[in-house]
């Protein structure tokens, strides 16, 4: 009996010692908070796994609910890694715009190292002068071969020319499907049409809708968003990288195939490159590489491998977001036929049928613009920005944020915040129309989909123009529908860009 009591006391003392040691390690690992500041609040997480179970399959929803309790600045753990979560339009603008230099970093996540061998402009951890110079170069190239006017074309700019051509081909492909099976999955055809636009801008060429290499690449692209979406456990718990993981293996395969495809395209451009005759973005990057003109003051040069990475970033950003936006738009059109009719009435009144829509028509089509804004807001198909990280010790709203802290920016929460939106769960384009029939500029600027500040998507303007032009050309010519009684599944599938379930029951007819 005495022996048992002695053992129980020993066990109790040992357990107490372990508890105190663990408590001390946790306290010691937390950064010292400067006087006058405090640590961000947040719920207690499980040992080892943190809040993974709480995040579930829809982290944007879980973290939005959490923000209602803990506020717009809160902290969770994924595994043992602390993650700052930002919600609320004012808070996010404060962090990414007013304090942009503090929050412009990228965390060195495992999945990010697999993109462009860790040298991606969008996903890589660099945020210094080299990154800034590459970003400026990419922006200039994108502007030169999309927004700039083409003297040999009647279109207002290169982008308008490319989109107009691809929209006409897309309509023809959909007509073929109606003449055959009598229905179609629009995503299958939209994705190639949009990919062809960015291919024309980057490589000066387009591909047939049955081009097998391009088809295999774009069909794998969904896996990309699934892995790099905010909250992927393998990014925070190293052991998960070594367990069987179909998504992660597919992600590695996709990045290798994309990289190989880009290398092949750039090698072909080098063979046919002619100084003074710049055909596309790739040619312009080669010219900068040869003349070492990326940033003369900093003496920064662009290597051949960096060209591959820049083009890869532009290609990825230029097709996935636009494809997803158009695909969601079509889903909203068939589930809201009243809205579709109203857009077409506006097109008929402003443009008619004798000419195709142009980018210059955009400011005269407020209901079309309101529909696109409401599609962006309601779907919020980019629920989080690509994760940020802090570049130095800083503070936000009275909370201390140490250097190197991973930061999730919840765009979905902004777009569904009841403080900003009346009945946010309702799809209502009219919310963006003022009493005099114009777009409400103040309200439209509250829709956040492309990030803010120094890491804002460089292709935002072009993406908005492209979505507008594709939809305007399609809806001027075509009416979309699904058969009576067919249920359209609008449930988002979580990822970096959230897709909807495939709908094979789309139908279309040319407008009389």
From Swiss-Prot:
Heme binds at residue 457. It comes from the Eukaryota. Its EC number is 1.14.14.1, 4.2.1.152. It is found in: Endoplasmic reticulum membrane; Mitochondrion inner membrane; Microsome membrane; Cytoplasm. It is a peripheral membrane protein. InterPro entries: Cyt_P450 (IPR001128), Cyt_P450_CS (IPR017972), Cyt_P450_E_grp-I (IPR002401), Cyt_P450_E_grp-I_CYP1 (IPR008066), Cyt_P450_sf (IPR036396). Keywords: Cytoplasm, Endoplasmic reticulum, Glycoprotein, Heme, Iron, Lipid biosynthesis, Lipid metabolism, Lyase, Membrane, Metal-binding, Microsome, Mitochondrion, Mitochondrion inner membrane, Monooxygenase, Oxidoreductase, Steroid biosynthesis. Its cofactor is heme. It catalyses: an organic molecule + reduced [NADPH--hemoprotein reductase] + O2 = an alcohol + oxidized [NADPH--hemoprotein reductase] + H2O + H(+); estrone + reduced [NADPH--hemoprotein reductase] + O2 = 2-hydroxyestrone + oxidized [NADPH--hemoprotein reductase] + H2O + H(+); estrone + reduced [NADPH--hemoprotein reductase] + O2 = 4-hydroxyestrone + oxidized [NADPH--hemoprotein reductase] + H2O + H(+); estrone + reduced [NADPH--hemoprotein reductase] + O2 = 6alpha-hydroxyestrone + oxidized [NADPH--hemoprotein reductase] + H2O + H(+). Glycans are attached at residue 67. Pathway: Steroid hormone biosynthesis; Lipid metabolism; fatty acid metabolism; Cofactor metabolism; retinol metabolism. GO terms for biological process: estrogen metabolic process; fatty acid metabolic process; hormone biosynthetic process; progesterone metabolic process; retinol metabolic process; steroid biosynthetic process. GO terms for cellular component: endoplasmic reticulum membrane; mitochondrial inner membrane. GO terms for molecular function: estrogen 16-alpha-hydroxylase activity; estrogen 2-hydroxylase activity; heme binding; Hsp70 protein binding; Hsp90 protein binding; hydroperoxy icosatetraenoate dehydratase activity; iron ion binding; steroid 17-alpha-monooxygenase activity. Its main location: endoplasmic reticulum. Substrate binds at residue 224. Coiled coil: none annotated. Residues 29-40 are annotated as: Mitochondrial targeting signal. Belongs to the cytochrome P450 family. A cytochrome P450 monooxygenase involved in the metabolism of various endogenous substrates, including fatty acids, steroid hormones and vitamins. Mechanistically, uses molecular oxygen inserting one oxygen atom into a substrate, and reducing the second into a water molecule, with two electrons provided by NADPH via cytochrome P450 reductase (CPR; NADPH-ferrihemoprotein reductase). Catalyzes the hydroxylation of carbon-hydrogen bonds. PANTHER family: CYTOCHROME P450 1A, STEROID 17-ALPHA-HYDROXYLASE/17,20 LYASE. Interacts with cytosolic chaperones HSP70 and HSP90; this interaction is required for initial targeting to mitochondria. Interacts (via mitochondrial targeting signal) with TOMM40 (via N-terminus); this interaction is required for translocation across the mitochondrial outer membrane. This is Cytochrome P450 1A1. The gene is CYP1A1.
